[in-house]
């Protein structure tokens, strides 16, 4: 028996920079348009940057493993520019489909914010794929092809002109690493903690969607 994907009460799009948010906006707008759900963009500030004082340097790592060292002032300017670009692109995309939208800035790592901000009925997307459009299949991690996450992945793939694929719920993050994943859909029936979520994001290198619960 096929389980229809539940409608989203609200669609949250989280990203730590505009480059990661950009490719995920199309996915977020497509999901929100499904049920006319309000769309909320959240720029996630690195908590290490906020903890730095004065001109103290902040270090971090990108997906490629290179270490970044920037001043707090320069990082603040970059976040301000990202916030403007993120909000502008989100507003334009939402306005084109007459969707309600809002934007805010919060602090924290993406997995922690996703699990902390999510409320019952919310769909949460974590944007992660630098500069690249969505091209690979939309993959659902779910046991069986008729569950709500699998059905949602199929609907989104069809709307985006992509393929859909279902992998077992217990698929380890390292199995996603070689796959050209366009987006990853996770059922909320799967227990996803912040550590596993971070590992899945890093391995898939694509937008990750926590599907709304029923």
Over which residues does each language-model region extend?
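Small/aliphatic-rich secondary-structure junction motif
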Residues: 2-69, 135-184, 199-203, 207-214
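Short beta-strand segments
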Residues: 43, 127, 187
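Charged linear interaction tracts used for macromolecular binding and regulation
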Residues: 96-100, 120-123, 127-139, 143-145
């Amino acid at each position: 028996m096929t389980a229809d994907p539940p409608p989203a009460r609200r669609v949250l799009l989280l990203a730590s920079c505009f480059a990661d948010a950009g490719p995920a906006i199309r996915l977020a707008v497509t999901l929100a348009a499904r049920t006319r759900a309000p769309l909320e963009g959240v720029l996630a500030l690195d908590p290490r940057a906020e903890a730095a004082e004065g001109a103290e340097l902040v270090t971090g790592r990108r997906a490629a493993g290179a270490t970044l060292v920037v001043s707090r002032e320069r990082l603040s300017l970059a976040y301000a520019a990202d916030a403007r670009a993120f909000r502008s692109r989100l507003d334009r995309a939402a306005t084109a489909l007459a969707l309600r939208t809002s934007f805010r800035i919060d602090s924290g790592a993406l997995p922690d914010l996703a699990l902390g901000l999510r409320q019952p009925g919310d769909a949460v997307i974590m944007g992660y794929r630098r500069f690249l459009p969505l091209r690979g299949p939309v993959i659902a991690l779910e046991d069986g092809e008729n569950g709500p996450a699998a059905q949602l992945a199929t609907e989104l793939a069809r709307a985006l002109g992509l393929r859909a694929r279902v992998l077992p719920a217990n698929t380890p993050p390292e199995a996603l690493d070689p796959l050209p994943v366009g987006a990853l859909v996770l059922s909320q029936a799967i227990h996803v903690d912040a550590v596993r979520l971070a590992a899945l994001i890093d391995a898939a290198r694509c937008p990750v969607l926590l599907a709304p619960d029923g």
